[in-house]
């Protein structure tokens, strides 16, 4: 059931690399918001942020496309995508380190008038 609601997740995207099972999961608060808005029935859901150009970024992009989340206003730059190294100890997640957001941590997203118009839709 779709609702006449539009949602936009703006900000972070990362992969959590679970080292003990050699598996990457996409995430980040803004990405998760956009995905769950779509799953909960938003007629339109988008993510707006900065991706790197590595395998982690391509994994997040493909995952968002699979969830029918719009990516029209994203930027993809040369560099590592945000990533965290994770394992599980006694059933709890343990974060082993990260690359501090990768390229997104080093680059500000500067909004222009076209971005602002898109956000109002």
Model-derived features with residue positions:
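Conserved N-terminal subdomain of the carbohydrate kinase-like
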Residues: 15-18, 43-120
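Histidine-anchored nucleotide/phosphate-binding helix
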Residues: 30-39
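Conserved acidic residues
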Residues: 5, 120-121
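A short, glycine/small-residue-rich beta-strand->loop->alpha-helix junction that serves as a flexible
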Residues: 21-29
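Short glycine/serine/threonine-rich phosphate/pyrophosphate-binding segments
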Residues: 29-30, 81
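Conserved strand-loop elements at the edges of beta-sheets that form or border functional pockets
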Residues: 9, 27, 76
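Small side chains
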Residues: 9, 37, 45-46
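Positively charged, low-complexity intrinsically disordered leader regions
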Residues: 1-22
């Amino acid at each position: 059931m779709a609702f006449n609601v539009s949602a936009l997740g703006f900000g972070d995207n990362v992969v959590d690399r679970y080292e003990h099972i050699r598996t990457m999961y996409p995430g980040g608060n803004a990405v998760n918001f956009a995905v769950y808005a779509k799953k909960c029935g938003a007629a339109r859901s988008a993510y707006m942020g900065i991706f790197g150009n590595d395998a982690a970024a391509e994994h997040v992009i493909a995952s968002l496309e699979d969830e029918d989340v719009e990516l029209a206003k994203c930027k993809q730059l040369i560099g590592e995508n945000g990533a965290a190294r994770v394992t599980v100890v006694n059933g709890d997640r343990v974060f082993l380190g990260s690359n501090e957001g990768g390229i997104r941590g080093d680059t500000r997203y500067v909004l222009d008038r076209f971005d602002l118009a898109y956000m109002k839709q």
